[in-house]
Amino acid sequence: MRIDVLSLFPDMFAPMRQSIIGKAIDKGALDFQVTDFRDFTENKHNNVDDYPFGGGAGMLLTPQPIFDAMASVEKQAGGKGRVILLDPAGRQFNHEVAQELATYDHLTFVAGHYEGYDERIRELVDDEISLGDYVLTGGELGAMVIIDATVRFLPEILGNAASAEGDSFEDGLLEFPQYTRPADFRGRMVPEVLTSGNHAKIAEWRLKESLRRTYLRRPDLLEKRQLTQQERDLLDNIKSEEQ
């Protein structure tokens, strides 16, 4: 997979070359490039923004440097891939969107600043995505979040498909509590069932605790899920326990 980012602050993305994503880059599973679109300005002051026609507060990113930076990416990569604009007005990012983006071979993110974009920039764009109903000072943090969540679904990244598949939201439930050694930490005991060796009982406990955590923290997820009879029975039991 190739990921390009157009940004005015490319140094912000340096930490992304560490940890799991860094390993994927080292393995050749991910080609990660950040382009400073200020380098493509055609004015002597290297300005990338200007006042909006018709008046109004703030400054807008001008189209020329972004168009030319995109052309450079297209030349280097043999295409611009799926172009994503980070914008508060875009569709909201979530687990399913991350899975969807992971199916593409090439993604290009446009991370803006200032009041917004000249509307003509949207001609380059295939998708507009927002992290939520709030405004950040720039698109860089949003791009980082989306990239990190997306590349986890690439087979080469985690090295264990179960790591991604077992995460919260993968099956519509929050993840169950997990424990490691020691079994007794200063009087705080690991649930006995987890050390029993009874895999059927462990699976049932994990399902029940996933349901409990979802019921208590994100009941909206249960409304979207088609519960099995076993899940309904466990949920009834949880509700009586939590009263």
Swiss-Prot record:
Gene Ontology terms, MF aspect: tRNA (guanine(37)-N1)-methyltransferase activity
Top enzyme class: transferase
Keyword ATP-binding tagged: no
UniProt KW Cell membrane keyword: no
Quaternary structure annotation from Swiss-Prot or TrEMBL: Homodimer.
Localization, UniProt: Cytoplasm
NCBIfam families membership: PRK00026.1, trmD
Protein name per its UniProtKB record: tRNA (guanine-N(1)-)-methyltransferase
Family in the record: Belongs to the RNA methyltransferase TrmD family.
GO cellular component, one term: cytosol
Disulfide bonds: none
Catalytic reaction equation(s): guanosine(37) in tRNA + S-adenosyl-L-methionine = N(1)-methylguanosine(37) in tRNA + S-adenosyl-L-homocysteine + H(+)
